[in-house]
Each structure stands twice: as structure tokens, then as C-alpha cells.
Amino acid sequence: VSSDPNTAPPSASQNVYDDASFFEGYRTLRQGDTGLNGALEFPALKRLLPDLAGLHVLDLGCGFGDFARYARAHGAVSVTAVDVSSRMLDEARARTEDGAITYLQRSIETYHAATRAFDLVVSSLALHYVEDYAGVVARIYDSLRSNGRFVFSVEHPICTAYPAGWVRDEDGHKQHWPVDRYRQEGRRDTRWFVDGVVKYHRTVETYVNTLLKAGFTLTHLGEPAPIPDALAVRPDLEADCRRPPVLFLAATRAAS
């Protein structure tokens, strides 16, 4: 039996993206990318990236491989793209013709990269599905080379704290977003396309201090709004200007 943790079968971590109903709903959502990913998350991510030329990159929760292909198109030498979902990876491989992108089916919590293997680690809207955030952060730190960067986004804690959605008036207009149980960190059972989608709520404080404790230097904290062009196409996204849907953090491993 191999002792390499990355040759083991995928773990029993949540894999809702392989649910047929969920996957079809998500794929439909991403068509044209006029939703949250295209209107807000990916534009904000690109603003935080270093020059990708010559870098070895790790993409945790790679989904359809959009970032992996972007990184290669902008000069990355190699991209290791990890996702727990076989459906997502099948779609990613179908969209990719590039031998320098390696797709691996693995949960984020069980993937172990080699020490100092990467210059950049990116994770887009995936770590709020992870229970052991501290363990993942520690392994990411170990996987980075000197001056390596970790850039990631998560669903904003004011959204995960009390996932009840907008409070609306009798005509259905959005009035306000309730925030409750903010300091009660832990599991939240939610509905997104299907019932039983598990997320893990953490405070902003925990997201930041866990990075610092692991040895990272925080370089950016952001709560971006949709870009103007997206609002012109999707005026309903104006609600995401009223409360931040996404939290971005960027951190660096010190030179050593």
C-alpha cells in the first residue's frame, strides 16, 4: 500500500457537486458567467494576483478549471488543479487542452502538496466548505516557496453566519440582510440547488488570525462589489452592493 496520501481514494468529504441536480444547476448558473463569479469574484481575484509568468501554481477547488487555464494563458509554468468532484473535473478536462495543467480528484482537506512546491496557491469560493481550515492553511504554508503567495475567497461571514436570506416586504422587495449567531462558528446546513449543502461559518477574525498563526503575512483583505459592467447587464446584483457576498484574503510566506 502506498504511503503517499495523494494516491488514496478521495475522502468522504462533502461532494455535493457530484449530485446530478446540484451539478446541472451550478453549470446553468455559470453559463455566460454573468453571476457572482463573473461579475465580482473573478475580477477581484485577478486584481490580487502577481505576475504569473514562470510560476508553479496550485488551484484548490478548481471547479471547471477556469483559473487554471487563465494562469497558463498568463505564463504560469504549471498548474496543479484539485477538486473533489468527478463531474467538475470531467468538465474541466473537456475544456482544457494543456499538458501543463494537472487535474487531481482530491478533497482540499486530504490533499498534501510537496514541501515548497508552489509559488502561488489560489482557492476560489471553496474554503467555506472545509471543516479543518487551520489544517489546510498550515499545509498551504508548507507548500509555498519563499515569498510565495496565498490568495483566496470565501463566502462572506455575514452570509454564512445566519443563512436565512434577505428579509423582504410584502411586495417581495429586499429590506435588509439579517446577521445573527456571528460568533457561533461551525457547521451550517443550507440549501443551494439541493438540500443538505454543508458550509462552515467562521468570523473574519478567525480567517485572518489563522493565517497569521501559520506564519503568513497578511497583504490584503477585501470585500469587493460587482463591477459596473456586470451591474449594467444584471441590475439584480445591486443587492451585492448593499452587503458583501465575498471575503478576499491574500497573504505571503516570508523569504527564507
Regions found by a protein language model. Name each.
Residues 2-52, 66, 70, 88-91, 149-186:
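Conserved class I S-adenosyl-L-methionine
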Residues 134-149:
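A short glycine-rich, Lys/Arg-flanked "PGG" loop and its adjoining helix->strand segment in the class I
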Residues 199-221:
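Short alpha-helix
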Residues 120-133:
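A short SAM/SAH-binding and catalytic strip from SAM-dependent methyltransferases
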Residues 214-216, 234-256:
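Core SAM-dependent methyltransferase catalytic element
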Residues 112-121:
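A short acidic, Gly/Pro-enriched loop at the edge of an enzyme's catalytic core
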